[in-house]
């Protein structure tokens, strides 16, 4: 895992990122555009063996020219680590060994609720919403990082101009 400033420096060029919502049974995946402005839901991977998961993620990374991974870190509302935080950290460590070192953990507070609320376009069909919830949560996590990145870049450009 990288410090956020180091991560940002390594992904500066036009490149795509993936966002991962690590869940107990399923893992949501979202992908950004090359300019790192918009996150789009991509897929949901059913948790099986780690080797199968790594194969699936490697394929996504290679086929989509991914340069960095943003993993949702499920922390409590008060900022303290949740029970699932260690699982997210372990996943980040393993992915950094198996795929790329360009990985950060990103605060995912309220991502599942936000994703569920934003899925209103699926109508009142709750089973459809639940089916898409993981990849929508990954989109919510990745979009949060992209928005942060955009604000950071805007602020940096403003300061340079002074």
Report the location of each language-model feature:
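Phosphate- and other anionic-substrate recognition elements at nucleic-acid/protein interfaces
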Residues: 1-18, 25, 30-162
